[in-house]
């Protein structure tokens, strides 16, 4: 899936923020770096390992522009798997709503 994510981002996105999603026992930077390796134009991508910061950054970059922001893969999951632990987390929808309220004040 990482190769496909990078290739699709390269083909269709003007800008992409690569972030964590249930890294489990893998290093987050390694996962994000692997996705980035499939994006030829590195200037149109940024790695932000914290998902909250990544979503907020993507929304801020789109502010005041005619853009569409896609927040993919997390969906309605209200948890994040890191190592062998599961942590409570906002869903992607909750994240977007929270940050849009902040940005659109």
Positions of PLM-derived features:
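ATP-dependent carboxylate-amine ligase
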Residues: 1-105
């Amino acid at each position: 899936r990482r190769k496909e994510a990078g290739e699709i981002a390269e083909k269709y996105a003007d800008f992409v923020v690569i972030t964590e999603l249930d890294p489990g026992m893998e290093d987050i930077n390694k996962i994000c770096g692997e996705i980035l390796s499939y994006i030829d134009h590195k200037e149109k991508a940024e790695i932000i390992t914290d998902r909250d910061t990544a979503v907020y950054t993507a929304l801020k970059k789109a502010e005041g522009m005619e853009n569409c922001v896609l927040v993919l893969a997390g969906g309605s999951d209200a948890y994040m798997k890191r190592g062998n632990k599961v942590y409570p987390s906002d869903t992607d929808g909750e994240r977007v709503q929270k940050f849009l309220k902040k940005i659109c004040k």
